[in-house]
Amino acid sequence: MSREFKRSDRVAQELQKEIAVILQREVKDPRIGMVTVSDVEVSRDLAYAKIFVTFLFDNDQSVIEQGMKGLEKASPYIRSLVGKAMRLRIVPELRFIYDQSLVEGMRMSNLVSNVIKNDEAKHKEEE
């Protein structure tokens, strides 16, 4: 009987929860601000983890770059807190990656909304 989920998937899910809590409560770096953990991918041997993050309310590229630098600087501290919170033989090395999918999704949603408004305005003019 095969398992429904791989162990790396379960670890990634738990890691996402723990890192979100740690970033919210423990990390005091002002560069980080309102950060959201959107996804976590863990390697099969659980040695590496890619943490995909987005910054809420920040569209400025320089603010995002500063936030990413802050996360990279805090990475060893976050890893140590993850090690205390989760019972793992090997605590994964954390790599933070900026996730643009949320920003792109909002942009696409705005484009669709604008097209719908323009289409409705044209139909009202024709009547």
Curated annotation (Swiss-Prot):
Q: Look up the domain of life of the source.
A: Bacteria
Q: Which InterPro entries match?
A: KH_dom-like_a/b, RbfA, RbfA_dom_sf, Ribosome-bd_factorA_CS
Molecular function (Gene Ontology), one example: ribosomal small subunit binding
Does the entry feature the keyword Cytoplasm, yes or no?
Answer: yes
What does UniProt give as GO cellular component?
cytosol
Instruction: Please cite one Gene Ontology biological process associated with this protein.
Output: maturation of SSU-rRNA
What is its subcellular localisation?
Cytoplasm
Q: Which UniProt keywords apply?
A: Cytoplasm, Ribosome biogenesis
| Coarse class of the protein's main subcellular location | cytoplasm
Q: Would you identify the family this protein belongs to, as annotated?
A: Belongs to the RbfA family.
Role of this protein: One of several proteins that assist in the late maturation steps of the functional core of the 30S ribosomal subunit. Associates with free 30S ribosomal subunits (but not with 30S subunits that are part of 70S ribosomes or polysomes). Required for efficient processing of 16S rRNA. May interact with the 5'-terminal helix region of 16S rRNA.
Q: How does it assemble?
A: Monomer. Binds 30S ribosomal subunits, but not 50S ribosomal subunits or 70S ribosomes.
What name goes with this protein?
Ribosome-binding factor A
> What high-level taxonomic lineage is stated for the organism?
Bacteria, Pseudomonadati, Pseudomonadota, Gammaproteobacteria, Pasteurellales
